[in-house]
Swiss-Prot record:
Protein name listed in UniProt: Putative uncharacterized protein ENSP00000383309
Composition bias, Polar residues: 1-16, 66-78, 165-177, 188-200, 233-254, 265-293, 309-329, 345-365, 373-383, 399-408, 435-448
Chain segments carrying region Disordered: 1-474
The organism of origin for this protein: Homo sapiens
Bias type Low complexity, positions: 17-33, 40-59, 96-122, 129-140, 147-158, 201-226, 453-474
Coiled coil feature spans: none
Amino acid sequence: MPPTASLTRSPPTASQTRTLPRASRTRTPPRASLTRSPPTASLRRTPSRASRTRTPPRASLKRTPSRASLTRTLSRASLTRLKSRASHTRTPSRASLTRTPPTASRTRSLPRASRTRTPPRTSQRRMPPRTSQTRTPPRASLRRTPSRASRTRTPPRASLRRTPSRASLTRTPSRASLTRLKSRASHTRTPSRASLTRTPPTASLTRASRTRTPPRTSQTRTPPRASLRRTPSRASLTRTPSRASLTRTPSRASLTRLKSRASHTRTPSRASLTRTPPTASLTRTPPTASLTRTPPRASLTRSPPRASLTRTPPTASLTRSPPTASLTRTPPRASLTRSPPRASLTRTPSTASLTRTPSRASLTRSKSRASHTRTPSRASLTRTPPRASLTRTPPRASLTRSPPTASLTRMPPTASLTRSPPRASLTRTPPRASLTRSPSTASLTRTPPGTWLRRTPPRTSLTRTPPTASLTRTPYTASLTRTPYTASLMRMPYMTSLMTPYKAR
């Protein structure tokens, strides 16, 4: 099919420009009508409507045998025009729109060709005589045609000198035009719009996702994109895990483009956002919406003591509170919350041990939140709900025993610990740091005395916050947060057994 596409695009142009030069010149008014701004304006409005508007000229071209020559002259002259437009800010995306459908037709020629450009297809219908007549000699004459084109399109030929690959563009638009689009992508905003408009066809390129993509594009384009614009950082989050999972299906071609876009400044995130909605739907968007109700998170930032508490229960409430509460494993905390030992624990080592129970997962969450601006915590929350559902919901009842959490609320030291410098001095996280090295964690969990030995000096030595900061930076801790293994660690009575040496102290 690609050779036929190239034949339909270029050699017949030569032959027809040779055979019907006056006809094509007389037809230049319809060519102008094709290039008249109304269809281009419709292109600016909606790429799909642009394809629709392309269809009527297609029909009108079906009347004229020189339609193939028209389409070719359109591709050559109008592509030069579009390139000169591409020098302007927004239009290059339109040029890429007009060009990318043929690449789609090249990939899956018949169906998408029928969608995007029947002109090449009809020219293919005309093709057999034309190909038999003009196959190779017209190519040679094609190489001659630039001179003839120079009479008509001398300024575009100057632009041809800028991009000699345009002739090859008409034959293989994707390669040259993609390179051009990448050079456009070097510009700040427009390439992203081009990429946005381009991604729907790539999504349609994906075989089965073609049916999925229309709703996806319709969802992402207007409302969820705006909602995602509210949380751009979530885009950065979705880039790492969800985009990988997402991109497996549609994005092989589009992902490469998105990576080149991602290298660009701001809008690539919006492009990734357009992809994100499916991930949001995968993550059960209603909970994400409930998560997007950041007031509790804002309240986290508002009240430091409440922030310390909100690490576990409010985040739980954000993420369908009971399961995340079970995530935070309040049952062990409840055992901790037996206020007499906790009173004894209220001595800062006890707060450290206390925070150990909720904080390994929740503090890692807060660390990831601290590394990100604010929204990543929501992403981590969205991650936690399934884990929360995995955790026993019965602890929800134990959660309902709010007295332990209330006793936590009594912990102003934990609040002050939430203020990172005292937390660093408590260095709950530094021993957790040693724990978070999962091999050592495994060994530590198996050998609690070894853990105590390691923890006792490290707590003093690790009181230096820098290791905690480095922990905050490592996605490894985030992966630990994801692993149910750490969750199981938090659930383990092992945690309480760990606290016992501190109590002894």
